[in-house]
From Swiss-Prot:
Residues 218-227, 249-273 have a biased composition (Low complexity). This is Small ribosomal subunit protein uS3. Residues 228-239 have a biased composition (Basic and acidic residues). It comes from Paenarthrobacter aurescens (strain TC1). NCBIfam families: rpsC_bact. The gene is rpsC. Part of the 30S ribosomal subunit. Forms a tight complex with proteins S10 and S14. The keyword DNA damage does not apply. PROSITE patterns: KH_TYPE_2, RIBOSOMAL_S3.
Length: 273
């Protein structure tokens, strides 16, 4: 299962978190779940259009009642900000026009782009578009990630590799990439290279090490507590007693008294006769 599923979704709530934070209201038009999801997709498409050189790793979205906060994680913040903030103002204006709310735009710099799977995949795709040999591009990216401190990396390319008539898939791996281990901190990225032979998909998995018990405890403490049966005061599993744990004395008197009452009735009838 871990070999096929998206590593971010597989570890959601364990080592990864949601990239969109908001609450939907099904009773209000424009605030339903489908409306917010559609709006998130349009925001991310707006960020990716014309911003290929900015090296955007991810976009986080958080909504409040009258404001939308957009955090852009980029390897080149200067391109996103623009000269004297002109590009940032343009992006903020388009986002406010799209959402109809006040937008707070935060531009965050990615300190180590060689360790970001999305940026690594985008870099390989750009080299494939420039007619660089796919094996050379893959191995160069893997060496850069390992020099940056990655404990393992896996790169896969699918499509008409090298202009071949028949499409195929090839992947290379260095180090450990434990996709089944939930505590493993694995970053995943995907990007498509638009070549003259067609599109080539690039997938990258980067293993950054296991999440320690201390980090998991900090994440659990930061997460809001949810009302579950196991969290109720008293015995584990709530105050409701199991069927096997109920005392037998509650059901025994009814079983004993019923035959006695049935036996007393014929005796009374015989005395009257």
């Amino acid at each position: 299962m871990g070999q096929k599923v998206n590593p971010h979704g597989f570890r959601l709530g364990i080592t990864t978190d949601h990239v969109s934070h908001w609450f939907a209201d099904s009773t209000k038009p424009g605030q339903r779940y489908k409306d917010f999801v559609r709006e998130d997709i349009k925001i991310r498409q707006l960020m990716s259009t014309g911003m290929e050189r900015a090296g955007i790793a991810k976009v986080e979205i958080e909504r409040t009642r009258d404001r939308v906060r957009v955090d852009i994680h980029t390897a080149r913040p200067g391109i996103v900000i623009g000269r004297r903030g002109a590009e940032a103002d343009r992006i903020r204006g388009e986002l406010e026009k799209l959402t109809g709310k006040q937008v707070q735009l935060n531009i965050l710099e990615v300190k180590n782009p060689e360790m970001e799977a999305q940026l690594v995949a985008q870099g390989i795709a750009e080299q494939l578009t420039s007619r660089v040999a796919f094996r050379r591009a893959m191995k160069k990216a893997m060496q850069s990630a390992q020099r940056a401190g990655a404990k393992g990396i896996r790169v896969a390319c699918s499509g008409r590799l090298g202009g071949a008539e028949m499409s195929r898939s090839e992947f290379y791996r260095e180090g450990r990439v434990p996709l089944h281990t939930l505590r493993a901190n694995i970053d995943y990225g995907f990007y498509e290279a638009k070549t003259t032979f067609g599109r080539i998909g690039v997938k990258v998995w980067i293993y950054k090490g296991d999440v320690t018990a201390k980090e998991l405890a900090q994440q659990a403490a930061a997460a809001p507590s949810r009302g579950r049966a196991g969290d109720r005061p008293g015995r584990p599993g709530g105050d409701r007693r199991r069927r096997n744990d109920r005392p037998a004395a509650e059901a025994a008197p009814a079983a004993v008294e019923a035959p006695a009452a049935e036996a007393a009735a014929p005796a009374a009838e015989g005395g009257q006769a």
